Amino acid sequence: MTIELLTPFTKVELEPEIKEKKRKQVGILGGNFNPVHNAHLIVADQVRQQLGLDQVLLMPEYQPPHVDKKETIPEHHRLKMLELAIEGIDGLVIETIELERKGISYTYDTMKILTEKNPDTDYYFIIGADMVDYLPKWYRIDELVDMVQFVGVQRPRYKVGTSYPVIWVDVPLMDISSSMVRDFLAQGRKPNFLLPQPVLDYIEKEGLY
């Protein structure tokens, strides 16, 4: 039997007990989702793929600072439509923090909670090009840019510059909005192919809009 003696000059390589954990890369697409439509899903999926994110959270607002509260249907309907819209789609997940917190949904307050709760996660906050114009007016924006990386997506008729750090992602130009869907329904027109069929079925079943 051979015995190997270790001397003070013997180099011993030790396997690290704890390997550095890879940080999670998570996108967030907030919105009223009144109702959710196909452009929402395309934006979320394209940003996830193009930036190589682990997942994108679809985060419905409870009471947006910029939307008339009277025009927003109850949150349980908006949440159910989101659940129907993303069923079976990999990489898209619903985040209900703002519905649970209630009150006005300021992005700074939400991201402060999420970043403190998940210190191992890098967040990418997705906004339309039309919202980039308003970044200087966002609540506590200078602190918010230290918490998240903003991702701007191109929409029809909007192309802007900004002094804030924004990653731009090109997505298929689909000029669809929730207000367009609501207008179609108010006029008695079916918004076929503008939103997932299960969502449209739910709207008709519940008599929404």
From Swiss-Prot:
Keywords: ATP-binding, NAD, Nucleotide-binding, Nucleotidyltransferase, Pyridine nucleotide biosynthesis, Transferase. Pathway: Cofactor biosynthesis; NAD(+) biosynthesis; deamido-NAD(+) from nicotinate D-ribonucleotide: step 1/1. GO terms for molecular function: ATP binding; nicotinamide-nucleotide adenylyltransferase activity; nicotinate-nucleotide adenylyltransferase activity. Transmembrane segments: none annotated. The keyword Nucleotide-binding applies. It catalyses: nicotinate beta-D-ribonucleotide + ATP + H(+) = deamido-NAD(+) + diphosphate. Coiled coil: none annotated. Its EC number is 2.7.7.18. GO terms for biological process: NAD biosynthetic process. The keyword Kinase does not apply. Belongs to the NadD family. PANTHER family: NICOTINATE-NUCLEOTIDE ADENYLYLTRANSFERASE-RELATED, PHOSPHOPANTETHEINE ADENYLYLTRANSFERASE. Catalyzes the reversible adenylation of nicotinate mononucleotide (NaMN) to nicotinic acid adenine dinucleotide (NaAD). This is Probable nicotinate-nucleotide adenylyltransferase. The gene is nadD.
